[in-house]
A protein has these predicted regions:
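Feature of Fe-S/electron-transfer and energy-metabolism proteins
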Residues: 1-445
Length: 445
């Protein structure tokens, strides 16, 4: 059964690969389903020599593409941070009163864990005291929204500094590194001891090196921006406040591995992130910093966005690849790993948002500074999200190896209520008794 499924998946991948990344099959399925006048799905299937059942199977997999979801007008966040805060039932009642009982649904974690009361309406996210202005929101009026608090407590900031906050800085750094030997870039990442920030902890330099040596007539770079864990909004911070850092990391990866195309898979629950990245990409293209023959070199690299449609599993790299290809987002058997057989069965690097931003920070600030923080297995700095139960909620850049007691009591300012335990690492993480913070540090081990 597994062999048959892998064989069928490979056929779909190859057929989907003929369409290419720019107008990928998942994008076509999503846009068609969400259109006011959808095309007969049989026509799309026929156009690409695919079975209708394949497209129906993919379409039915995603929450946002189901009729039951499309009939709603507003969605209340049901992430664990909002649920634990006890704000959502009253919020749901208010929205039902304004819009109707059958017009309010639920959506999983909108990344507003620092203020709660989160809900989604007409393509935008709202939270905190925004519900008090619901009449203005329904009328389509813009309202002032609170921004999450962010601050670096790191010895050296790699993720929150302003060294790549303008297109001029992007141009200067790109001009420098496109003249640098690719092996030197890989060596910098290896020497830094940077490991993947998405959870697996695989050495980033090693992943880039493996893919650079893989045989293939086409290679891809994917930014995994499907941040689905409740309580996490660090990727959202980087996408919205440090988009050039993330994009620069992708460009450098493309340069090293020999890729001319990349894609950011951003969850649909983050409309502001999609807007910020899209704006940055368009700006860089206008300046000739993305596209054909960048800065007059023979290196070409283009970027696009793929918008997730409500599937938590897409945070797993093989499920994410399946999604872009227009398949059901199901985890594939490994090996082969994406670095040798990834998107459309071509060598592919899949990196998390924070990993790419950290790679940029390392190239700009130096690998020695990064590796000197923390230890060999947990080096550098890490973004930590503290939700609304802390007196100082927000996203912070913190040295690896920092005691959890310091993070909770000094940086977080203690708690607004008496706590027994805390959740770490999202649904797949764990619940840890509060007493254990005396024995824990911020690291991967």
């Amino acid at each position: 059964m597994i062999k048959k499924r892998v064989f069928v998946s490979k056929n779909i991948s190859n057929l989907s690969g003929r369409i290419g990344l720019k107008d990928n099959l998942f994008k076509q399925i999503s846009e068609n389903t969400l259109s006011e006048k959808p095309q007969d799905i049989k026509e799309i299937a026929k156009k690409h020599n695919l079975g209708v059942s394949t497209l129906h199977g993919a379409e039915s997999f995603y929450e946002f593409l189901r009729p039951s979801h499309r009939e709603k007008k507003a969605f209340v966040c049901n992430g664990s941070a909002c649920m634990c805060a006890g704000t959502q039932e009253k919020l749901k009642d208010t929205l039902k009163e304004k819009l109707g009982n059958d017009k309010v649904g639920e959506m999983f974690c909108l990344g507003h864990c620092y203020e709660n009361h989160a809900f989604h309406y007409d393509g935008e996210n709202y939270a905190g005291k925004d519900i008090e202005k619901i009449d203005q929101i329904i009328k389509g009026e813009e309202i002032k929204q609170e921004k999450f608090f962010s601050k670096s407590f790191a010895t050296t900031s790699f993720l929150m500094d302003d060294k790549l906050s303008s297109t001029d800085q992007f141009n200067d750094q790109l001009n420098k590194f496109l003249k640098t030997d690719k092996k030197e870039i890989v060596k910098s990442l290896l020497d830094s001891n940077l490991t993947g920030r998405g959870g697996a902890g695989f050495p980033t330099g090693m992943k880039w090196d493996f893919c650079s040596k893989a045989k293939g007539d086409k290679k891809y770079v994917i930014c995994n921006a499907d941040e689905g864990d409740s309580g996490a909004f660090s990727d959202r911070y980087l996408l919205e406040d440090q988009p050039l850092k993330v994009i620069f990391g992708m460009v450098m990866c493309g340069f090293v591995i020999g890729s001319d195309e990349g894609v950011l898979y951003i969850r649909g629950e983050y409309p502001k992130s999609i807007e910020a990245i899209n704006g940055s990409i368009n700006q860089l293209k206008k300046l000739g910093l993305l596209g054909e023959n960048i800065l007059g070199t023979d290196f070409s690299f283009d970027l696009g966005i793929c918008i997730g449609q409500g599937a938590y599993i897409c945070g797993e790299e093989t499920a994410l690849i399946a999604s872009i290809e227009g398949r059901r987002a199901e985890v594939d058997v490994r090996p082969p790993f994406p670095v040798t057989e990834g998107l459309y069965k071509k060598p592919t690097v899949v990196n998390n948002v924070e990993t790419l931003a950290a790679a940029t920070g390392i190239l700009i600030n130096g690998s020695e500074k990064f590796s000197s923080i923390g230890n060999k297995k947990s080096a550098g700095t890490k973004l930590v999200c503290l939700d609304s139960f802390f007196n100082n909620p927000g996203v912070y850049e913190i040295d690896m190896g920092t005691p959890m007691k310091k993070i909770f009591n000094e940086i977080g300012g203690g708690y607004k209520e008496t706590l027994k335990a805390f959740q770490i690492g999202g649904p797949l993480g764990g619940v840890v008794p509060l007493s254990e913070i005396e024995n824990l540090n911020l690291d991967f081990r």
